[in-house]
C-alpha cells in the first residue's frame, strides 16, 4: 500500500485539529450560555439593553455593537455567543422579529470578522494568496465599507418601520427581570474578562472555559435565590449548588418568571442543546474530507476556471467556486484554501494583484458560510442565536450583498 505524501498527512492532521477545537468550542458555548443565564449576566444585558436602546435604532445599534466586538475579538462565533444572544433576547422583548435581529447580529459579526487582523479567515485568505495581512485588509475595505453602509441604511429604515412611534413601554419587562434576578453592572465583569482574554490572543476555548467557571462562581455569589429555586429548596447545600451548576452546564434549565416572553428567553440547553449542531459539524467534516480526498472539490473549481476567459468571468468564477464549495463541502476553510490555490495562477497570468484574489475569497467564502444551514458556520450561528438560517437569511444583507459588491468593484 502506497503511503500518502507527508504534506497530505500534515494537512489532514491540521484540519482534524481545527475541527476538534470547533467541536469543543461548541460544547463550551452551550456551557457558557447556561452559567451566564443563572448568574444573571444575560438577564443583566437584556435589562440594560431595554433601558438604554431606543427601539427605533435598535437594529442598526445591533450591527454597530456586533461590529465593534467582532473587530476586537476577530471572531464572529464569539460575537454571537456573547452579545449576540443578549441582543436577540432584547429584540424578542421589544417585539422585533427574531430573523431581523439575527440578520443584524450576523451582519455586524461578519463585518468585524472580515476586517479584524485577529480573524482566522482573514489571516488564512492572506496566507493562501501570499498577501501581506494589512494590505489584504486595506483591499477588503473597498468592498466591505460600501456593503456595511448599504446594510446600515436598510436596517435604519426597517427600525423605523418596525417601531414607528418609538413609545414602547418596557417597564413591565424591566420589573419582571429585576424581581427575579439581582441586576448589577458588576455582572459585566465576566463578559469583559472574556473579551479581554480573546483580544489578548488567549485561545478561544480557554477563554470560554474560564468564562463558564467564573459565570458559575458569580451565580453562587449574586443569584443564590436562582440556585435555590433550581435545586427545589430554600437553602441549598454545597452539593445541591454543585448539582444545579453541573445540570446548567450540561443540560437544559428553565427559569420561570411572571412574564411569558421572559420565560422563553431565560431558558438554555447547555452542552446538550449543542449536540444537534455538533453532529451536523461532524457530518460536514466527514463529507468535506471525502469530497476533498476524491478530488471533487478541485474538479468543481477547474470546471469554473475553464469558463473564465475574461477578467470579469475570472472574478465571477472565483465567487462561484467559493459558493459551490461552501455548499458542497460545508466548510469555509476548504472553500478559501481550494479556491485560492486553484485561481492563484489565473490571477497572476492576467497581471491582477493577488490582493484581488484574497479579497474575493473573503467576500464570497467567509461571509456566505453563515447563509447555508448545513455549513458549520450556518449551523453554529443558528443554534447559538436560536434563530434558523431561513429566518435570518433575507436580513443578513451584508452577507449576501458582499459577493455582488466584489463583482461590481
Annotated model-derived regions:
Residues 23-32, 54-86, 280-288, 294-342:
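Hydrophobic alpha-helical transmembrane segments of multi-pass integral membrane proteins
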Residues 105, 113, 117, 148-164:
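Transmembrane-helix bundle segments that line or gate the permeation/cavity pathway
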